[in-house]
Regions:
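Compact nucleic-acid interaction/catalytic patches
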Residues: 252-257
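N-terminal, charged low-complexity regulatory/assembly segments
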Residues: 1-92
Length: 257
């Protein structure tokens, strides 16, 4: 890569799609501009709980009679991952604020009803601040907050479950991008501060420490564990995941509870 790309203050001559290399080469970059793909879902629909439930019906049909909390949580994980990857790539490599508010983007779902891609009207605007409240306002205030409110309403799962899902992906992908040769170090510090700050904009930060580390007794391994369970164990098709805080608990009893 040209050295100029690494110099602070330099406008990187890269498109968003150009950044999908290395650990992200198997991900699909968002479509930007042009015609909206046939069948793509306007995300602003999800401000309406009934329409959100309608658009989740295909995914929910995979688990007939399944716990709504777990179904909504797993659906959200697909969605949050699909949104988080391009948002963080744009933040950390291009210093750009993608138009990922619910009113701006369209979501492309696969045949199972899971998010697999996005359509964006453009590739965003260049950031002029490292303030975490301002840098993440589009993602948090215009997308995650209203969507999580609706997901909680239709499923009965606590909002903190969905915030934990979202924060877990921020934690994972920011650590992946930290090793990228073109990462903007100031933007990286700001993103990590998002996960390390107890408050955000004067209020409790729902993304605070979504993943924690601990060393199991008698082991030299340092393990990363989610702060909150994603509830997937409530579906008969799943056990807990590898970084679940409930590992080792009586999950059958929890299901009955």
């Amino acid at each position: 890569m040209p050295l100029a790309l690494r110099q602070p203050g330099t406008v990187l001559p890269l498109s968003l799609a150009d950044c999908y290399q290395g650990p992200f080469e198997h991900f699909t970059p968002p479509l930007t501009g042009g015609a909206v793909p046939h069948g793509a879902i306007k995300a602003s629909r999800w401000r309406n709980a009934a329409l959100l439930e309608e658009d989740m019906a295909c995914y929910a049909s995979r688990y007939p009679g399944g716990d709504k909390r777990a179904i909504a949580s797993l659906w959200s994980k697909w969605h949050f991952s699909t949104v988080t990857v391009p948002t963080l790539i744009a933040h950390l490599l291009l210093n750009r604020d993608l138009p990922v508010g619910l009113d701006d983007l369209y979501v492309i779902q696969n045949e199972d009803g899971c998010a697999q891609g996005l359509w964006l009207p453009h590739e965003g605007e260049r950031f002029t601040t490292q303030d975490i409240t301002e840098r993440f306002a589009t993602l948090i205030e215009q997308h995650w907050a209203p969507l999580i409110e609706r997901l909680s309403a239709i499923s009965g799962a606590a909002p903190r479950v969905f915030w934990s899902n979202a924060g877990g992906y921020v934690d994972y992908y920011v650590n992946t991008l930290a090793a990228h040769p073109l990462v903007n170090q100031e933007a990286l510090a700001a993103t990590r501060a998002l996960l390390e700050s107890r408050t955000l904009n004067g209020q409790r930060n729902p993304l605070f420490e979504p993943v924690r580390t601990y060393q199991p007794s008698g082991s030299e391994e340092v393990k990363r564990v989610r702060k909150l369970c994603c509830l997937r164990y409530l579906l008969d098709e799943f056990d807990v995941c590898g970084n679940c805080p409930l590992e080792g608990c009586d999950r059958q009893a929890r299901r009955k509870g």
